Design a protein with these regions (language model features):
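Transmembrane beta-barrel domains of bacterial outer-membrane proteins
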Residues: 1-55, 62
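Outer-membrane beta-barrel translocator/channel fold
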Residues: 4-21, 114-208
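Transmembrane beta-barrel outer-membrane domains
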Residues: 18-24, 56-62, 72, 89-93, ...
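Hydrophobic, lipid-facing positions within transmembrane beta-strands of outer-membrane proteins
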Residues: 23-29, 45-49, 61-67, 94-98, ...
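Residue-level signature of outer-membrane beta-barrel architecture
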Residues: 33, 71, 102, 112, ...
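Repeated loop/turn-to-beta-strand initiation elements of outer-membrane beta-barrel proteins
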Residues: 37-43, 76-81, 107-110, 127-130, ...
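Transmembrane beta-strand segments that form the barrel wall of outer-membrane beta-barrel proteins
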Residues: 41-51, 77-87, 95-118, 134-136
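Outer-membrane beta-barrel "beta-signal"
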Residues: 97-103, 163, 202-223
Length: 223
């Protein structure tokens, strides 16, 4: 189980944008099923409200799911194969997932779920983990009625430094700080009230996340 909140504050160097904030509030619920010593199944359901939060309604709601099989080759190597789905405002977003998990040493781990995420993580204490993450994401935000309920499509590539601190084997405090070297926007289904150029010329900005989540880590469960 987990929850997250993201807020994108838009800033234009030349003038003020018509849309100044895009926000997303999400709840994740997932589980891990061990089939045998070598195979496991992971599932995750994500429910999200994603919009400018001007006039909230059921039109701002999205639902998604992730599922994959994990094969453990040995105590240091795992591979994953699965599928990602999210109901975006332009329609369903579906693509395959190829994952890996390499234990490089007692404290160093390299893992990812391609094409969306790659992590390099170092265990700094019994409960603390420090890492570097690469994210690629395409998502959408519903606009208010004054913009004809159009939506903004965002594509971004992010680099993040993060820290996780486990209060116990499942509950963790997390924080992240990073930068998006690539961020692009497109606007769809509007009536001309919001010119496209108002979103494509924004300066890339620093970002930060913090929160509390319930996570199941196989390496902690095995200890």
């Amino acid at each position: 189980f987990g929850a997250g909140y993201n807020k994108l504050s838009l800033k234009n160097s030349s003038n003020q944008p018509l849309v100044s904030n895009l926000e997303a509030l999400s709840i994740q619920l997932g589980g891990l099923i061990n089939v045998d010593n070598d195979w496991s199944i992971t599932t995750l359901i994500v429910q999200k409200i994603s919009s400018d939060f001007e006039d909230l309604s059921k039109k701002d709601y999205q639902i998604g799911a992730v599922g994959f099989l994990t094969k453990q080759l040995n105590e240091h190597v795992k591979y994953k194969l699965g599928l990602f789905y999210n109901q975006e405002f332009w329609g369903p977003q579906i693509f395959p997932i190829l994952g890996f998990d390499f234990i490089l040493s007692d404290k160093l781990r390299f893992f990812g779920l391609l094409p969306r995420m790659i992590n390099l993580e170092y265990q700094i204490s019994k409960s603390g983990y420090l890492g570097f993450k690469f994210n690629m994401k395409r998502t959408s935000y519903r606009l208010a009625q004054q913009y004809a309920h159009g939506y903004v499509q965002e594509f971004k590539i992010e680099t993040q430094a993060y820290i996780d601190y486990y209060l116990n084997d499942k509950v963790t405090l997390y924080g992240a700080f990073g930068y998006a070297p690539i961020r692009k926007y497109k606007i769809f289904e509007t009536t001309g009230l919001l010119p496209k150029d108002n979103l494509v010329k924004f300066d890339n900005q620093l970002m930060a996340h913090a929160g509390l989540a319930i996570r199941i880590r196989s390496d902690r469960a095995e200890k």
